[in-house]
Amino acid sequence: MKIDSWLNDRLDIAKEAGVHRNLRSMNGAPVPERNIDGENQTVWSSNNYLGLASDRRLIDAAQTALQQFGTGSSGSRLTTGNSVWHEKLEKKIASFKRTEAALLFSSGYLANVGVLSSLPEKEDVILSDQLNHASIIDGCRLSKADTVVYRHIDMNDLENKLNETQRYQRRFIVTDGVFSMDGTIVPLDQIISLAKRYHAFVVVDDAHATGVLGDSGRGTSEYFGVYPDIVIGTLSKAVGTEGGFAAGSAVFIDFLLNHARTFIFQTAIPPASCAAAHEAFNIRTSLKNMGYVVKGDHTPIIPVVIGDAHKTVIFAEKLQGKGIYAPAIRPPTVAPGESRIRITITSDHSMGDIDDLLKTFHSIGKELHII
């Protein structure tokens, strides 16, 4: 077909650049030792940070809800899809995040898009970090407000942008709490300080911080002891289930319920997923020394920058040949020249697993003349 010829040309461009992707078949529960495409591998790229996705207590909670509510919600929350489990989980999230209320979305992606496409108005401006997640970028694109991008966690540049945007009616500073490709933590205390000085609102996507940062895992707010206006999050990482949420004031949540299209027109996540997530809330430098460029703060994400996309793919293939699954991260997920192996450490990994990982990185790095 004519369309296939055109699409194949576009796919060939991706292949030549080393950024063509394909799917891998993961067999079994999301634990470190998994069978991938028929090969036994140790997985180092999962977001199951606390090991809860395979926790028996979550599975039991989901099974009990499945027996009572069935496999799907069969409607949007505003029609027939709302259940006691959705409401219980929202109350649990609000309590955990120390906000007045929370609202569930089908994913963290849809939560960001829903908030940013509905809340800021035409006379407003969104100030967005340069390395914010794709869902924030897409939400900004769909918003009626203008968008101004500031340099990654550069507070001087953010302040300059705040000075330059004082003509707008309202300003929203939007940032990841933990940046998923670098593992760096946003200086949220400094952002809150600037927001107060310049009368701006702060929206934080805590997808990779919830359950990980802070003394009780409440995220960047607890880590820094500050309170942003709005917190976005996901249930698919440390919480171990599926779905996303927005948390803030009761008025804000009422607004989203009536205006966020990604909430109004979505089928609600299954009650069983809500029950499992509710249970999850109830449970509560060697690489650098080798000579690798290692980014990241005190989070489970450890990005090891290789640089060239083709070499990164080769590195990932050699890892897999040694029984280690850590896929190559390439453009457009990261900038050109920033291709990397993104390692995520989970509570299910043993010290023996970590030792094996380090030894393998050392040998492959030497073989490919990276270190």
UniProtKB/Swiss-Prot annotation:
Pathway note: Cofactor biosynthesis; biotin biosynthesis
InterPro entries: Aminotrans_II_pyridoxalP_BS, Aminotransferase_I/II_large, AON_synthase_class-II, AONS_Archaea/Proteobacteria, PyrdxlP-dep_Trfase, PyrdxlP-dep_Trfase_major, PyrdxlP-dep_Trfase_small
GO terms assigned for molecular function: 8-amino-7-oxononanoate synthase activity; pyridoxal phosphate binding
Required co-factors: pyridoxal 5'-phosphate
One GO BP annotation of this record: biotin biosynthetic process
Annotated residues for binding of substrate: R21, H133, T333
N6-(pyridoxal phosphate)lysine carried by residues: K237
Superkingdom of origin organism: Bacteria
Catalytic activity of the protein: 6-carboxyhexanoyl-[ACP] + L-alanine + H(+) = (8S)-8-amino-7-oxononanoate + holo-[ACP] + CO2
UniProt keyword terms in alphabetical order: Biotin biosynthesis, Pyridoxal phosphate, Transferase
SUPFAM superfamilies noted in UniProt: PLP-dependent transferases (SSF53383)
Enzyme Commission code: 2.3.1.47
TM segment ranges: none
Binding site for pyridoxal 5'-phosphate: G108, Y109, S180, D205, D206, A207, H208, T234, L235, S236, K237
Protein role: Catalyzes the decarboxylative condensation of pimeloyl-[acyl-carrier protein] and L-alanine to produce 8-amino-7-oxononanoate (AON), [acyl-carrier protein], and carbon dioxide.
Family: Belongs to the class-II pyridoxal-phosphate-dependent aminotransferase family. BioF subfamily.
Assembly: Homodimer.
Protein's name in the database: Putative 8-amino-7-oxononanoate synthase
